[in-house]
């Protein structure tokens, strides 16, 4: 059994009702038009991007799916355009995406809430490998959920910008945070070499000791830390906080149940600071989602080629 969305099929059918696209198709079939191609599935494509007809309902469905579903969580206009332009093409696409996002009431509310000046930030050295140098911060003041969570712990890899969101309570002890870090982060990425945090130095030092206690090691380790995040890390934290707060406006008191999808949405969306999605930097390609179903399916990279491409991208 092959699972695939019906959206592409509906776009192909609707292309036949669009006069402009039919004119282009006729030119392609006559060998006149070179920028456009007819794909093996019968769709008209521009640079391998499927051409979306001038159908307001169809375009609205695509924009809605790319902006405010559980796995996208109100991405900004630039991120939406970067993501969608890899798969879809239509006239004035960038402008229509910007207009769609500008009209989103949830986005307007969140953007207005976090306007605040930032201090002087010191640049940090670029890491040489994934998840060895991390940034951590806490998003507090969140509504208490039925599970009693009222904060989110944000942990970001400074190289790939990939991140994890962990629901917590403000009153969690350092020992409990260390055990949670070991359970959710160490098992996937190992132990960090440096920790960047806006928290005071005592917090980082005590957290480091608690982490090694949770690991059960008797070896003595030391780690570097920075008392203030760099510009890129602070921006990443702000993006994640915005996504959290939009989710809260949509999901209300059950926001912690949606954290896995918020995490996925962030990691699978374009980040200007690295020129790709965090998943691409981490794994070599973006992960499959309903809106990127066919895009991922057409790229089959395995073994050494996948590793090499991931290394080249970062």
Please state what every model-predicted region is.
Residues 1-314:
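Integrase module of LTR retroelements
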């Amino acid at each position: 059994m092959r699972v695939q969305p019906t959206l592409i099929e509906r776009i192909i059918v609707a292309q036949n009702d669009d006069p402009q696209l039919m004119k282009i198709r006729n030119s392609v079939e006559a060998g006149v038009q070179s920028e456009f191609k007819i794909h093996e599935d019968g769709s008209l494509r521009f640079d391998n991007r499927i051409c979306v007809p001038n159908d307001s309902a169809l375009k609205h469905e695509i924009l809605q799916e790319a902006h405010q579903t559980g796995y996208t969580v109100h991405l900004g206009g630039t991120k939406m355009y970067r993501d969608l332009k890899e798969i879809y093409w239509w006239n004035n696409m960038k402008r229509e995406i910007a207009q769609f996002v500008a009209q989103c009431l949830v986005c307007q509310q969140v953007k207005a809430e976090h306007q605040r000046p930032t201090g002087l930030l010191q640049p940090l050295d670029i890491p040489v490998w994934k998840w060895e140098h991390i940034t951590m911060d806490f998003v507090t003041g969140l509504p208490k959920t039925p599970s009693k969570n009222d904060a989110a712990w944000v942990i970001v890899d400074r190289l790939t910008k990939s991140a994890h969101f962990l629901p917590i309570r403000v009153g969690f002890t350092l020992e409990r945070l260390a055990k949670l870090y070991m359970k959710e982060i160490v098992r996937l990425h190992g132990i960090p070499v440096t920790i960047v945090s806006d928290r005071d130095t005592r917090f980082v030092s005590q957290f480091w000791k608690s982490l090694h206690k949770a690991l059960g090691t008797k070896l003595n380790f030391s780690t570097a830390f920075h008392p203030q995040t760099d510009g890129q890390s602070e921006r990443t934290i702000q993006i994640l906080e915005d996504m959290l707060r939009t989710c809260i406006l949509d999901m209300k008191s059950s926001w912690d149940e949606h954290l896995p999808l918020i995490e996925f949405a962030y990691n699978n969306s374009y980040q200007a600071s690295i020129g790709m999605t965090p998943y691409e930097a981490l794994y070599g390609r973006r992960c499959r989602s309903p809106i990127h179903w066919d895009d991922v399916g057409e790229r089959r990279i395995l073994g050494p080629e996948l590793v090499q491409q991931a290394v080249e991208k970062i």
